[in-house]
Amino acid sequence: MKTYSSYVNFLCSLMAIDIPDICYCFKEQYYDVNGFDVEPFEMESHCKSHVIPDENRVYVNLNEMYGENDIYFILAHEIRHCAQYQATEGIGLTDIALPETIYKWKREFSRYNPCCNDESCQEVELDAMAFTWFIGKVLLNVDVDLNCDEALVEPYKQYIRRNYSLMEIKERLDYSGLEFGRNQA
């Protein structure tokens, strides 16, 4: 059973956030990021994941994934939502986004629905998509298809590219013990 704990540690270290509780479902097994059994949870069958930001909790349905990269992208996206919420609560780095963006996130999280509904025009979704794109590009050397209007995501991509240096990424890789991606970074 794979837990992706080094990858989760890398993402959380990079964004300087509290590590979320991550629960996986795979072939009727339910477990956490440490491999311990957790209470079974329900998700819509087509959902790959959902996040409960105010509980700092992520649920991942590994049965719906198309491969390892899909899992890495989903975890990056959902953990970014945790970072966004923590930023609205004053936890983590203050430079995760501009203050006006964090204010918009706070408003959106007050109405946030963690289900699989398409909320792709929300600031929290655009930023999470841009972060996923960034992680795909930097760690996996893959262009992530975001299935959205590139013009909407581009400002977030620019901010994220400026916010994380190559040196910082390499340091966080070393710190987390994450093995893959060293050649790309």
Regions found by a protein language model. Give the residues of each.
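Short alpha-helical catalytic segment bearing the HExxH-like zincin motif
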Residues: 70-78
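Catalytic Zn2+-binding segment of zinc metalloproteases
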Residues: 79-96
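Metalloprotease/metallohydrolase-associated module, dominated by Zn2+-dependent proteases
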Residues: 93-179
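Short, solvent-exposed loop/turn segments at secondary-structure junctions
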Residues: 29-31, 65-66, 90, 136
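Active-site scaffold of zinc-dependent metalloenzymes
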Residues: 35-69, 82-86
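Zn2+-dependent metallopeptidase catalytic core
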Residues: 1-21
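Non-catalytic terminal regions of proteins
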Residues: 22-39, 57-62, 73, 172-175, ...
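Hydrophobic (often cysteine-bearing) scaffold residues that line and stabilize catalytic clefts
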Residues: 4, 72, 120, 124
